[in-house]
Amino acid sequence: MGKRTNPRHFLVTWSLLLLETAFGLTSREVNKTLCIEKERDALLEFKRGLNDDFGRLSTWGDEEECCNWKGIECDKRTGHVIVLDLHSEVTCPGHACFAPILTGKVSPSLLELEYLNFLDLSVNGFENSEIPRFIGSLKRLEYLNLSSSDFSGEIPAQFQNLTSLRILDLGNNNLIVKDLVWLSHLSSLEFLRLGGNDFQARNWFREITKVPSLKELDLSVCGLSKFVPSPADVANSSLISLSVLHLCCNEFSTSSEYSWLFNFSTSLTSIDLSHNQLSRQIDDRFGSLMYLEHLNLANNFGAEGGVPSSFGNLTRLHYLDMSNTQTYQWLPELFLRLSGSRKSLEVLGLNDNSLFGSIVNVTRFSSLKKLYLQKNMLNGFFMERVGQVSSLEYLDLSDNQMRGPLPDLALFPSLRELHLGSNQFQGRIPQGIGKLSQLRIFDVSSNRLEGLPESMGQLSNLERFDASYNVLKGTITESHFSNLSSLVDLDLSFNLLSLNTRFDWVPPFQLQFIRLPSCNMGPSFPKWLQTQNNYTLLDISLANISDMLPSWFSNLPPELKILNLSNNHISGRVSEFIVSKQDYMIIDLSSNNFSGHLPLVPANIQIFYLHKNHFSGSISSICRNTIGAATSIDLSRNQFSGEVPDCWMNMSNLAVLNLAYNNFSGKVPQSLGSLTNLEALYIRQNSFRGMLPSFSQCQLLQILDIGGNKLTGRIPAWIGTDLLQLRILSLRSNKFDGSIPSLICQLQFLQILDLSENGLSGKIPQCLNNFTILRQENGSGESMDFKVRYDYIPGSYLYIGDLLIQWKNQESEYKNALLYLKIIDLSSNKLVGGIPKEIAEMRGLRSLNLSRNDLNGTVVEGIGQMKLLESLDLSRNQLSGMIPQGLSNLTFLSVLDLSNNHLSGRIPSSTQLQSFDRSSYSGNAQLCGPPLEECPGYAPPIDRGSNTNPQEHDDDDEFSSLEFYVSMVLGFFVTFWGILGCLIVNRSWRNAYFTFLTDMKSWLHMTSRVCFARLKGKLRN
């Protein structure tokens, strides 16, 4: 639901300000304070016990004046150290967070700091050591924070001596919290956090309620569902000052486990019950908490009844989060039940639920600043009735089924972020968008919007604009961008737009993300890109550019991560890519007219696509840089030649390599076999020769396509023993000889096996029925795409390979072949013997081609079990005997070729088999029956049930038909008017009938909604 303010921060800030005021600390006065020698030595001794790998204590000891050391503050009058603050700041520069922690032990030398009142050692690593007992002797402490610092053991009982303590934070350690008796001595304590430890204190409620000044209590992740206070303890509780209560992640499943909190109805202002397991209706008693301002119920299992009507009493509520609670409720009703807080509510989180209906007039909530409604079932309109001007600053309606036009957006002049993506909005983006002067993010992606107004150009604060995947039409000119000086992220992907700007146009922005695929920007290369110096992503694919690559384009920004110029008609040479400062690069220049030698590949390249161009010459330059980060390389369909260099062992992360359709020669490099992460290898249609090197280490390999080369030798046994993940194996059009190894039958995931056009001999293995996928009748195969890893949000870069296969007697290339095709092709070899009967067990097979071999014997009798078979080619063999009757059961069969064998007898009668051309059966001298000549002496069977008098039979049929239709009309007339007449005459019947219909309609509607909501919830969980 976005970044939220923790109430604890207000308390801490307030406490720190009080400390600063009380001790009169200013940086200017501290600098004049003289350090006390004894305390300086104590601090240096404390430093010696720590490991400072990040130099955070580098100032300690550089000068005599310890009051100027980092993290130290002294009293301006006495010089005593009063503040020791060594907490680590957590930063998240990328996708991982980092903190420069201190490690080691806490030295008892701190006892020399007798006047210390502020100690913060949080977010460090004290190596599972116990909290030093001597800290309990620092009696002047008012602030103690040891959270997230890897302390273990029990909390020292000596903490009872810290009677001046106002803030105590021991959260997120490995502490064992057994006894809290010491708490009752801390009469000044206002803030207590014990969450995220091994909580075992059964007496927790009794002891905590003895702390008279406690205002904020954090017991998150304490497993409190196991320690429910007794009714007697609750009745005797006297904690009347408690204002803020954090109970997140305690495995509460019913309200009875936290009902004690309603005893503090006169003081509680903030409650956090998020991330529990509450699965029933929300407790009505929340409505009795008259001072409640902040309520977080997010991420629970279910709020069956939605927002209860008692919430109308919460007139001070300004924050409510019910996101991801499986709330099923009509949205207008929900807003009605919150009407009591319409003047106070500022933040409302309802995302990830099953809310339905339209967006009501939210402008009635005059203080509402943030509204989260994404990922629901909203299926109506956006504000059917126009209201007053709204104070909303953040609105997210994405991932719903909202429809209709957008309202007048001028009603939301304070909006900073507007997320409307993944809906069904239609029409034009309203002109009023130009009046949202504070708007920073505008996302209308994945809708059906058609028009983009020029008023967009007035949004001087707009930073991100995403209108991708709509049906936007027309021409974009400079006017659409005239004042977008803050814009850094522009996404107009996959619309019907043309970008028409002056040749010398200089945009007012400096973009970081440029996504304009399928926008018509041609035919010239857009010169305004020369003015952009900071982009990390540039995608102008499918932009209808037919131009030479300009010389200035080689000056790419050093921040560049992703470059996509694919599917244009750009020509010219690419000599070298800029060396990016980033950890990785993705370059896609595919489907253009680039020529020349292979450009020098950047060392940080992760995805590199040059396929479908006119590059030529050697690719030896690929070895000049160690491109160990590369995960996917596609150089296919160019004019590269020569031997492929043997340097692939340095690309240990490579998952996809496609070198197909080039003029490579020589041997397949041995180092390819060292790529343990390789999933797909395409080297078909080259001139590789010699033996195939071992790929036994490539145990993740799913596609091995090496067809159309001059490889020799036997099919290696390691294919069957080590490549157990194979889904496609294509060795077609090579010079392999010997028999098909039976070990190949261990490839249980295999969907396509193509060994055609080789010199294979021997018998077909009888174990082909071990191909598990090919035995399954139900379902299609898996997709042939690979989600190649890379570090750019929103996720993986999809690589979809293609495959050259013989399908229905035609050689074709298929993308995503595995979604549908299940094929065995052993044609054009020298195989002998019979067709194994086990082959009929492959009931999921769609194409079987055994043609052009020397197979003998009969056609397998059980072939009729292969119900999904669409193509069967057994031609040009030595097969004999009759065509099995079961062949007539193959209703999907559209290609059949049994020609040029020694088959005999009559072709089985069926609509399917007789529909094929004569050529499907030709070359079988003893075969007869349609579509060939009829067999000699054949007489069609007589229908013994036929009538000897056809005319009489026809008359009977005519009479029966007439009688049937007359009776049907009379029956309908009597029944219809009988029921309708009763309803007209009898009013009570009429009312009952229509009430029944209305109730039935409502029941069906609500039942379907509830079932859908529950199913949606289960899928999310």
UniProtKB/Swiss-Prot annotation:
It is found in: Cell membrane. Glycans are attached at residues 31, 145, 161, 236, 263, 313, 483, 534, 544, 564, 593, 650, 663, 770, 778, 849, 856, 889. InterPro entries: Leu-rich_rpt, Leu-rich_rpt_typical-subtyp, LRR_dom_sf, LRR_N_plant-typ, RLP23-like. The keyword Membrane applies. Its main location: membrane. Residues 25-109 are annotated as: N-cap. It comes from the Eukaryota. Interacts with EIX elicitor protein. Involved in plant defense. Confers resistance to the fungal pathogen T.viride through recognition of the EIX elicitor protein. This is Receptor-like protein EIX2.
